[in-house]
Amino acid sequence: MATINQLVRKPRSVKAAKSNVPALEACPQKRGVCTRVYTTTPKKPNSALRKVCRVRLTNGFEVTSYIGGEGHNLQEHSVILIRGGRVKDLPGVRYHTVRGALDCSGVKDRKQARSKYGVKKPKA
């Protein structure tokens, strides 16, 4: 335990919180260009082919972003928007692709949770 005199001479330092999404640089989203679109397999005990892409961001970072939803139209050189949010069973994937923004289309025939997948309200 520090004495009062020690604390007067050198106050306690506040630990700076480390960001989970450093490539966003405190922005809500960032734009980038797909450099590679591929599938990868999740950690045990899950099994699937998860759709992901490598993205070169406008600030120079190169990150891996998850493409949510069923089916996508992304390929190399597609311009996309990414947001934060990791994928628990894919190590190293800390960003999500925003569906329905820039070159990334919304999910076809989506009826529920449409706002998360960039789908307009269907005509009644």
Curated annotation (Swiss-Prot):
Keywords: Methylation, Ribonucleoprotein, Ribosomal protein, RNA-binding, rRNA-binding, tRNA-binding. The modification 3-methylthioaspartic acid is found at residue 89. One of its GO terms (cellular component) is small ribosomal subunit. It comes from the Bacteria. Pfam families: Ribosom_S12_S23. GO terms for biological process: translation. GO terms for molecular function: rRNA binding; structural constituent of ribosome; tRNA binding. InterPro entries: NA-bd_OB-fold, Ribosomal_uS12, Ribosomal_uS12_bac. With S4 and S5 plays an important role in translational accuracy. Belongs to the universal ribosomal protein uS12 family. Part of the 30S ribosomal subunit. Contacts proteins S8 and S17. May interact with IF1 in the 30S initiation complex. NCBIfam families: rpsL_bact (TIGR00981). This is Small ribosomal subunit protein uS12. It comes from Serratia proteamaculans (strain 568).
